[in-house]
Amino acid sequence: LRSVELVTADGEFLRASETEHPELFWGLRGGGGNFGVVTGFEFELHTVGPEVATCLVFYPADRLGPVLRSYREFVADAPREVSSLVFAGELPDEELFDAGDRHRQKFAIMGCYAGDPDEGAVALEPFRQFGDPLADASGRMPYVEFQQVLDADYPDGMRYYWKSCYLDDLSDEAIDRIEHWAAAAPSPLSTVDVWQLGGAIADVGVDESAFRGRDAPFLLGVEANWEDPDADEANVAWVRDCLADMGRFSDGSLYLNFAGFL
């Protein structure tokens, strides 16, 4: 984001950037919508695609601890073009799994390489070699299609309650607790997620915008996704209990898109 145009509460039209109203620009980058009505954004674009190399590989839950330890070491030195997410739960996908594996506890590694697809296939290959996968849907696809690949998992009308915290480190103890909470989810549709951070996110200094987590290596997301209103209490409690437990591995800050304020 290079600049923002907005109308303030007193009707003044302003342009905010690093050189024009820089304090306002600082707040707009992460501080929400309380500064005025934004009428325009100026972004610096970067060419990606049209096709990218992607990874989506599923492993049995009993491999989560060892794989997260290997994952931690790999992403620390991975190319900047690699972004990834580990999510653990039952993941009952009818298209990917037969009846025997559909309701088995498992986890997935999803990744993308924002560069040459041939180079990306090589860069993402370690994610596919952490053990014997239950399913592997990795391959090349249009970048815009990859951006939508999880949309169908979150239909309108479902019940959702999510929270998050930035992790100071993906320590062995933190990994053990992630295993525990993934197995304890009351809904088969719920997941515990580990998001890889760093890269361009960390290029911006911690004090250069109103956005927390610039220096965090990982984000923990806890997603309760369920259908039965009678299960509200159990699912909300699971999320809150998980975050209360995982707070010892965090400075207490969170990603506002996964805030779960209620």
Where are these predicted regions, by residue range?
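Soluble FAD-dependent oxygen oxidases
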Residues: L1-L262
